[in-house]
Amino acid sequence: MWYVVDYLYTRAATYLEPRGFNIEHCYLIELGELTPKSPDYIAGHTSQQTHDDIAELLERLRRRPEIEAVSLSQNSYPYNGSNSGAEVSYDTLRSPGWTIRRLVTPDFPRVFRYRGTRGETPEQLAEMLERGEFMASDNLYRKYDRRMTDLVGQRFYLFGDTTKTYRLGAALQNVRYHDYDQARSSYSMMVKQSFYYIGLELCVRVREGQDNDFIERLKADSESQFRIGNIFIS
């Protein structure tokens, strides 16, 4: 009986902890690519053209007045159920082996309203990613009793590569994996356009008051505005 009570209390306490993200007014949109079986398929498209087409699609979405922010990411959006990992090292400090790596475009913090421990806004975090800096959860080195907030501005090794360093732009307010999981160690860095492909997550945040019929309106324009080269949304 006491075990059940303790379990339920722990689950409830975890649920009530800050999530570190906000998904109100956010939508996940699927990217697709025409195959040679389609009569509209454009043969001879290079990988670079595909990267450029996806980038243009993002820009067209950003220009829609009802959309506030648009992002691409890999294994990064809340509740996605998948993750990637890689080591973050500084001097003798090493991140846990299960540290979550989020590859994102700069607007990702704006879509999900990430914030820094020093009060950095989503807009400021986006600018840091644009500069090539990375961001890490404040609990990344908790096994050493070190807060990442105290290491902002320092340079780190990522992916086990000791030939290049990356500047820590901000420590993030801890981001949870889902509602019943405590915040895990994680870091975020910018995904380059040369890595764009249809398997990435396309997420948008619409402006307050614009949710009504948003998906229907977007679908109505998808063929005329959001099929670029062989790339489309669905």
Can you annotate each of these PLM segments?
Residues 50-52, 103, 130-131, 154, ...:
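Small-residue transmembrane helix packing/gating motifs
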Residues 28-31, 71-74, 135-137, 152-158, ...:
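Short beta-strand segments
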Residues 7-96:
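Membrane-proximal extracellular/periplasmic loop immediately following the first transmembrane helix
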Residues 94-185:
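Hydrophobic secondary-structure segments that place a key small or acidic residue at a functional site
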